[in-house]
Amino acid sequence: MPALVTNKFRIHNAKQFVEAFDEVSYSSGGTVTDSSGLLNTNMYLFIGKVTAWSDDTTPPTPTDAVANTHYENWRDMIAAKKITSADVSHVIPRKNWTNNTSYFAYTHAEANLPSQDFFVMTDEFNVYKCLANSDTTSTGAEASTSIVKPTGTGTSIIKTSDGYQWKFLYQISAADALKFVTPNYIPVDTVRRANGYLANTYDGSPGQNQYDVEVAAGSSGNGAVEVVHLTTRGANYLGETGALGAITNSSTFVISGATFTKDDCIVNNDIYMTSGTQSGQGGTIIDYVQSSKVVTISTDGSGTAVGFTGAPAQSDTYAIGPKIVISGDGQAANVRCTVNSSGSINAVTVVAGGNNYSNASITVVANTNQNQDSPAIANPTAATLTPIVGPAGGHGSDAVRELGGYYVITNARLEYGESNNFTTNNDFRKVGLVAQPKYANGDYATASVVDQATTVVLKSWNGTTYVADELVTGATSGCTGRVVDFVSNNTLRLTDIIPSGNSTSAGYNGVYGYFSNSEVIAANTGGNGGSGASATANDAGSVTGGDLTRFSGDVLYVENRSPVTRASDQIEDIKLVIEF
């Protein structure tokens, strides 16, 4: 049977992952019983694999076999650094605003909206959503190029002179830009929560602007029609702009009427006030006398003009055009239009978006008997307008959901040696995320950094330096490991520990086959491809395992890379992008 896993499902999973870094565990009685097991204190970025791939320029694709995900990645692990909620963000593909480029206009009918270029980031790190472009088709297709960069951080729709309409969504802070912006992705977040601010630090900051947008969007309600796409402009419509003459009352007044050559030719058209106390209001024309230029507007039972709260004043400006009727399952949307000198619709204004529409359509109404009397006026050729229903909550209410934020980025900065937990004398080829690792005593790990190499303090060294990546073997145990580094001529750090299955003696950890505290640990001789270095483990306590119990956590993500060489004066800024 046909089925669909929606983008909302993907975004839900991504949000659950991000929100898990702030979750709190409770017992059935509502008391916090174990904060050590929380995800925000128990997710680590790890590095690993000192040995080369078969081709270091083309690392192999990781597999999800248990042998690899659960075992090999742990054996290769060198060190790990904790990821906190401040190190995680939703991200979306980066789309820089570029002059003379076409952008897709949002439409509720587009099945694969996140794949379209319908939002941009400007050089001020402002993110805008494209709601309309000049000559937008009903499907939102790119019909013209954007030549005016959107600017501003207000809550209203931004209309630029090239015909585009944009909605400001949010601004990326300098701190977030440094941490989460990459050549291919930018961060996205929703700052408002049910109980108000996510944090109380938004006044005058980029977060305040986004909060204002989210609040304004919420006040418009669900299913508002904030934009109308003009598909075909039609022809032979009557309309004009001008200033009112004498006012009789709220429903009767004199207009310019320069282009209206006969009685009632504009009956059923709308008049819309563009200045004065009635600005933004308007009504439907029911009578027009050409000789006196007097129009009459429909009234209610009390004689008050429908659509006006009072009488306009002489010299107030107006626009007359075809009446726009919106049909659908919502309410209160109000749209007006104007026409050009050729009788085609040249602009559409949304006076009120209404709410609760899930579907809507537009009918353009004008007097269809314009040629009934002399002089003849051609009947209009119908225009096609498409009302665009906004997302749940309104444009800007939830940027993560609206822009397809089903990608999550984690960021970790490996600074120098990280208190000697991270080697600066070797490279690595794996980075990944491990959740819920534990210490040897069974507690969940909480340290900010952990050293996962096995450390051996040596004596009786033969003077030959152990070489990074080479294989060493315990003379008694038969256990093998790979050299991470050799420190101060007396400390060997190893990874990829493989105990011997033939050993009959317990190792340092009480398990047969592991390195023991007093055995000789030697590299192969030079003739067999090794350095020939050799030394003896320095008795009791000289061998210690990594800080984390191997195989105790879940490897959630792994990425194979070409070698990354570390140095004592170097910082690695590691960003992992996960798609849900």
Regions found by a protein language model. Give the residues of each.
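Extended assembly-interface regions of large multimeric machines
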Residues: M1-F125, L131-S138, S146-N195, A199, ...
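Conserved, function-critical positions that sit in or immediately flank catalytic
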Residues: D162-F580
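Short, surface-exposed terminal/edge motifs of secreted or surface/virion proteins that either
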Residues: N126-K129, N133, K293-T299
